[in-house]
Curated annotation (Swiss-Prot):
Keywords: Chloroplast, Iron, Iron-sulfur, Metal-binding, Plastid, Transit peptide
Organism: Arabidopsis thaliana
Gene Ontology annotations of biological process type: iron-sulfur cluster assembly
Keyword Acetylation: no
Pfam families given in the database record: Fe-S_biosyn (PF01521)
Note on cofactor: Binds 2 iron ions per dimer. The dimer may bind additional iron ions.
One Gene Ontology term, aspect cellular component: chloroplast stroma
Summary of the function given for this chain in its UniProt record: Involved in the assembly of chloroplastic iron-sulfur proteins. Is able to transfer iron-sulfur clusters to apo-ferredoxin.
Gene field: ISCA
Annotated protein name in UniProt: Iron-sulfur assembly protein IscA, chloroplastic
């Protein structure tokens, strides 16, 4: 399945460049309205002033499917250790995971327990085997697909982050660089 990643117009009001994935599709049309039959929910118009407007764009929600990977996942060891830490506090807490500027590579991971009532409406809430993870929208851009692991090894133990969005990580594994 191809996804449109960019739309450009030229000085000719009937010329549309549509970038799909990593390839460019350019087509010259003789009318001011362009429709994409395979994308029946999108109808694009080019007016005479070289402006591109979207008349309608409603995407049906994907059906809930079993077996989908969560946006952020926990290894079995991380889940056990976090559950133990949460139970020691004796409260109904969730884990907030995020990123902030800093660290050896430019961005560092943040993790802390917080009361579920503190979750904001725009936060992503991920239920993972009975454990709740909360992440703000900006951090989710950098953490989507990440797996949190835990090791109790004497050397190199603790939490580790396996982040598919990281282009570079520091030696300690607590900070990373990502291109957006």
């Amino acid at each position: 399945m191809a996804f449109a990643t960019g739309i450009t117009t030229s000085s000719n009001p009937t010329f549309l460049g549509l970038k799909i994935s990593n390839t460019s599709l350019r087509s010259v049309v003789s009318c001011n309205s362009i429709s994409f039959p395979s994308l029946s929910y999108v109808n694009l118009n080019l007016n005479r002033r070289n402006r591109l407007s979207v008349r309608s764009a409603s995407v049906p929600a994907a059906p809930a499917m079993e077996g989908l990977k969560p946006a952020i996942s926990l290894s079995e060891n991380a889940l056990k250790h976090l559950s133990k830490m949460r139970s020691e506090r004796g409260e109904d807490l969730c884990l907030r995971i995020g990123v902030k500027q800093g660290g050896c590579s430019g961005m560092s991971y943040t993790m802390d327990f917080e009361n579920r009532a503190n979750a904001r409406p725009d936060d992503s809430t991920i239920e993972y085997q009975g454990f709740t993870i909360v992440c703000d929208p900006k951090s989710m851009l950098f953490l989507f697909g990440m797996q949190l692991d835990y090791s109790d090894a004497l050397i190199g133990g603790g939490f580790s982050f396996s982040n598919p969005n990281a282009t570079q990580t520091c030696g300690c594994g607590k900070s990373f660089a990502a291109e957006m």
